């Protein structure tokens, strides 16, 4: 049994072990994806973020 979660009508995250929410929708895993230091696709990910202006350095500076 793996921990699953879904978003209820109020927008709250609800944790369960069932594969389906009471509304009949599929639940998603409550655990984050594993991080691997041997990331094969990091170069492509950075290139895509640079192309679409999603890098943190391409945003306006934060106002503190």
UniProtKB/Swiss-Prot annotation:
Keywords: Nucleus, Ribonucleoprotein, Ribosome biogenesis, rRNA processing. Its main location: nucleus. SUPFAM superfamilies: Nop10-like SnoRNP. One of its GO terms (biological process) is pseudouridine synthesis. It is found in: Nucleus, Nucleolus. Pfam families: Nop10p. GO terms for molecular function: snoRNA binding. It comes from the Eukaryota. GO terms for cellular component: Cajal body; mitochondrion; nucleolus; ribonucleoprotein complex. Component of the small nucleolar ribonucleoprotein particles containing H/ACA-type snoRNAs (H/ACA snoRNPs). Required for ribosome biogenesis. Part of a complex which catalyzes pseudouridylation of rRNA. This involves the isomerization of uridine such that the ribose is subsequently attached to C5, instead of the normal N1. Pseudouridine ('psi') residues may serve to stabilize the conformation of rRNAs. Belongs to the NOP10 family. This is H/ACA ribonucleoprotein complex subunit 3-like protein. It comes from Arabidopsis thaliana.
